[in-house]
Amino acid sequence: MEKVMTHLEQLEAESIHIIREVAAEFENPVMLYSVGKDSAVMLHLARKAFYPARPPFSLLHVDTTWKFREMITFRDRMAAECGFDLLVHINEEGVRQGINPFVHGSAVHTDVFKTEALKQALDKYKFDAAFGGARRDEEKSRAKERIFSFRTSTHRWDPKNQRPELWNIYNAKVQQGESIRAFPLSNWTELDVWQYIYLENIPIVPLYFAKERPVVERDGMLILVDDDRLQLRPGERVEMKSVRFRTLGCYPLTGAVESTAATLPEIIQEMLLTRTSERQGRLIDHDQSGSMEKKKQEGYF
């Protein structure tokens, strides 16, 4: 009798197929590793896809210099434990100019340390494909992006010029300098990700679990006081609150949520009841009209 695959098994099989397809079709692929929960799942799937061999590509982390300290510690540990080559790229010109999210704002900071830094890294190592952990349920511009997302020689994305994807057939043809961003988790939801992490016992950054942390309420968000670069504004004060993060980015631009969910089952239960997007806590999604789509057109993840 034929075994009926569960919903998560179907998603896993589709993702592994996409990862293998990219590895087979492209000469020099790389996996973007942001250290978040989606990256953790994608890394786990890549290891499964080629087990017992090591995946035939490196990990690339674009370091904005403003990531949570726990993320950097976790990144280095996971890369070492999994045996991956970890490439870390920083936009040194941005560092020299002293660009930071407090003085220059989230839009400029994101453009310099994420978008431009990613384009620099892709050009430097001549990658023709890059895996990303974006999902269609996260945000409206990502909802209309293909699994194989074509990028021009300048890394730009044109939402009106996308290739058809029929069933599980993907067009991997690119000219010199062009590239593809591949999204194996496109059809997953946030709840799918958490259930898979629980079932597969996948390690994740402790910031996803609720505990008492020092936070400041700023612009309607709870910002973690992660280091001494966070300067308090007049009237602000640091409070200890039980919080966790649904999404991770640069700490001054990522809001925590008040929560008591300290275990995976508790997080899953919380997800079953929530009615808001996980990216509501990402300031970069709201710093201008059509923010995410504009960033993606310019070369963002």
Curated annotation (Swiss-Prot):
With CysN forms the ATP sulfurylase (ATPS) that catalyzes the adenylation of sulfate producing adenosine 5'-phosphosulfate (APS) and diphosphate, the first enzymatic step in sulfur assimilation pathway. APS synthesis involves the formation of a high-energy phosphoric-sulfuric acid anhydride bond driven by GTP hydrolysis by CysN coupled to ATP hydrolysis by CysD. This is Sulfate adenylyltransferase subunit 2. Keywords: ATP-binding, Nucleotide-binding, Nucleotidyltransferase, Transferase. It comes from the Bacteria. One of its GO terms (molecular function) is ATP binding. Belongs to the PAPS reductase family. CysD subfamily. The gene is cysD. It is an enzyme of class 2 (transferase). CDD domains: Sulfate_adenylyltransferase_2. It catalyses: sulfate + ATP + H(+) = adenosine 5'-phosphosulfate + diphosphate. It comes from Syntrophotalea carbinolica (strain DSM 2380 / NBRC 103641 / GraBd1) (Pelobacter carbinolicus).
